[in-house]
């Protein structure tokens, strides 16, 4: 292919444009499958989604396509397209095809599984998270082959699309163990990541981890009349309030012992990139649930607080009587649910130990304390920004978007650290969605031209990697 006449030397762009209409038709078909992994009533749809993807891969010419549907995990899809050069690097593209529930469905302006086109946007559950981005990478492979005129890609491309990410990937470790040989690679490309903004393209280099737990204080066997025992027995609700108050100091720093001991701070170059990104406080607050003002750890910008600083958040408090009117009691039980966002090189198990120690220090005599972990937690991950694969992704995105690209991170969590740990290779990020795509919410959408630019970047990346990783 000779390339786009308006963009000489960019054959990937011309190839993406040639496939764009077909891409949109296929993506809409896939989005019509309600693959809600968290709902057992839709597990058949998750299987249908996996088989739809497998069929699409075969139509595209992938020579090795499999649906992994044995065992307890919901169906995952694996595919491999070997490079012509057996010495070329092997790259594993990771994504997921399960989607979030659609509740509250009455707040959708369009049916969540009809994939409605509105101007440049495609509205539907999974459009952004993550079917749209997986489809983007499939288009990238097609465009790469068309642009190079080759029958095989410049790198061996493997695809691993799981069906349980939105449920916390409970069987991902098992899949990685059982299929270790199939998934062996030199690099992982993580699809489930956004740009910073439509006019501020970025390359993500890491995401925070998370650990969650519930702390329960118990006093007597039952609630007791406050006139009978108030002031003479410890109050679990008061103790929970004091525990919560002690969780942070006046500057918002978390007071668990050695909480910051393992924190690795971003480089000066990364912080400079974050500072160079456009930031509108009013717009940011509006997208943060309509918050009324900023707060947080001194010495760090809002973006840094969200991306590269650890946090402790109170998710909910329960105890005593909260119904209409007044009930004069000393409650027998009170609890608080906490979540901790973690950054490299914090570990969920160390935070769990620190939380238990903190609770023990703040448990009054006469109360029983229990710390209930909500899962094992998810470790954080960050890739070295000087790694040649990261530089290749940045160059590919910069060429596709025709403007400077900066590094970013994301405040959420995902299985990047797990993939890195099991496969023993770096994880880089290449996505083209937006933070305001309303993922997990009504009217989830994706901006189609951004997906096309992302596909162009992916197509170019496959061409760059053999030289960069040599």
Model-based region annotation:
Residues 2-105, 333, 337, 350:
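N-terminal helical capping/dimerization or prosegment-like subdomains
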Residues 20, 31, 57, 61, ...:
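Structural signal for hydrophobic packing residues in well-ordered secondary-structure cores
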Residues 86, 197, 255-333, 344-357, ...:
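An extended, acidic, His-containing surface patch that forms the Zn2+-binding/catalytic region
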Residues 88-158, 453:
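Active-site metal-coordination/substrate-binding segment of hydrolases
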Residues 105-117, 208-219, 395:
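Acidic-glycine-rich active-site phosphate/pyrophosphate-binding loop
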Residues 127-294, 303-310, 421, 443-451:
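Fold-level recognition of mixed alpha/beta catalytic cores in primary-metabolism enzymes, strongest
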Residues 128, 221, 340-348:
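A generic structural motif
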């Amino acid at each position: 292919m000779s390339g786009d006449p308006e963009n000489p030397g960019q054959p990937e762009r011309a190839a993406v444009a040639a496939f764009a209409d077909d891409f949109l038709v296929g993506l809409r078909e896939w989005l019509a499958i309600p693959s809600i992994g968290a709902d057992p009533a839709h597990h058949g749809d998750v299987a249908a989604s996996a088989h739809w993807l497998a069929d699409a891969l075969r139509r595209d010419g992938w020579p090795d396509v499999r649906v992994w549907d044995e065992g307890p995990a919901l169906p995952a899809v694996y595919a491999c397209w070997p490079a012509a050069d057996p010495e070329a690097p092997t790259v594993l593209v990771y994504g997921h095809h399960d989607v979030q529930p659609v509740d509250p469905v009455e707040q959708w302006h369009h049916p969540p599984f009809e994939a409605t086109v509105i101007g440049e946007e495609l509205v539907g559950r999974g459009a952004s998270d993550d079917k749209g981005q997986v489809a983007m990478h499939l288009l990238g492979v097609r465009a790469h082959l068309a642009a190079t005129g080759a029958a095989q890609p410049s790198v061996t491309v493997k695809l691993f699309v799981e069906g349980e990410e939105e449920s916390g990937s409970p069987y991902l470790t098992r899949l990685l163990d059982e299929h270790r040989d199939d998934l062996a690679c030199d690099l992982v490309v993580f699809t489930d990541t956004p740009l910073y903004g439509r006019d501020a393209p970025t390359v993500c280099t890491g995401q925070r981890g998370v650990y969650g737990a519930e702390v329960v204080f118990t006093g007597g066997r039952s609630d007791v009349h406050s006139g009978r025992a108030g002031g003479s027995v410890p109050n679990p609700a008061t103790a929970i309030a004091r525990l919560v108050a002690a969780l942070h100091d006046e500057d918002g720093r978390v007071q668990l012992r050695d909480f910051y001991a393992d924190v690795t701070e971003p480089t000066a170059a990364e912080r400079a990139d974050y500072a160079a990104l456009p930031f509108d406080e009013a717009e940011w607050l509006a997208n943060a649930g309509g918050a009324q003002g900023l707060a947080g750890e001194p010495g760090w910008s809002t973006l840094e607080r969200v991306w590269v600083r650890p946090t402790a958040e109170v998710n909910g408090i329960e105890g005593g009587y909260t119904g209409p009117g007044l009930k004069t009691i000393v409650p027998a039980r009170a609890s608080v649910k906490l979540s901790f966002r973690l950054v490299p090189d914090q570990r969920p198990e160390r935070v769990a130990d620190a939380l238990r120690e903190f609770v023990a220090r703040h448990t009054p005599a006469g109360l029983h304390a229990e710390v209930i972990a909500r899962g094992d937690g998810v470790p954080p991950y960050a890739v070295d920004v000087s790694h040649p694969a990261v530089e290749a992704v940045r160059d590919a995105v910069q060429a596709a978007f025709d403007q400077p690209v900066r590094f970013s991170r994301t405040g959420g969590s995902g299985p990047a650290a797990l993939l890195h740990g099991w496969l023993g290779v770096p994880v880089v990020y290449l996505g083209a969605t937006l933070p305001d795509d309303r993922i997990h919410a009504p009217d989830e959408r994706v901006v189609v031209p951004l997906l096309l630019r992302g596909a162009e970047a992916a197509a170019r990346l496959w061409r760059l990697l053999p030289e960069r990783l040599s």
